[in-house]
Amino acid sequence: MAQGTVKWFNAEKGFGFITPDDSDGDVFVHYSEIQTGGFKTLDENARVQFEIGQGAKGPQATGVTLV
């Protein structure tokens, strides 16, 4: 399981990007992959843990949880 920092997240559009600790490229994150109750959003610079899958346009975070 990878860890990283939320680069940005737009709650209105429901997506953003995470910068993994062990990679140069950012990873797309969709609100549906955030594993929290209630309103699913991420704060900028929040520490997260996630799996990396392959989306239609590149790497995508799955199973995202706050660290």
From Swiss-Prot:
Membrane-spanning ranges: none
Cross-referenced SMART domains: CSP
Swiss-Prot/TrEMBL induction comment: In response to low temperature.
Gene3D superfamilies attached to this UniProt entry: Nucleic acid-binding proteins (2.40.50.140)
A cellular component term, taken from the record's GO annotations: cytoplasm
UniProt entry keywords in alphabetical sequence: Activator, Cytoplasm, DNA-binding, Stress response, Transcription, Transcription regulation
GO MF annotations in UniProt: DNA binding
Organism of provenance: Arthrobacter globiformis
Name of this chain's protein: Cold shock protein
SUPFAM superfamilies per the UniProt record, alphabetical: Nucleic acid-binding proteins
Span of domain CSD: 4-64
Record's keyword annotation contains Cytoplasm: yes
Alphabetized Pfam families for the sequence: CSD
Subcellular location: Cytoplasm
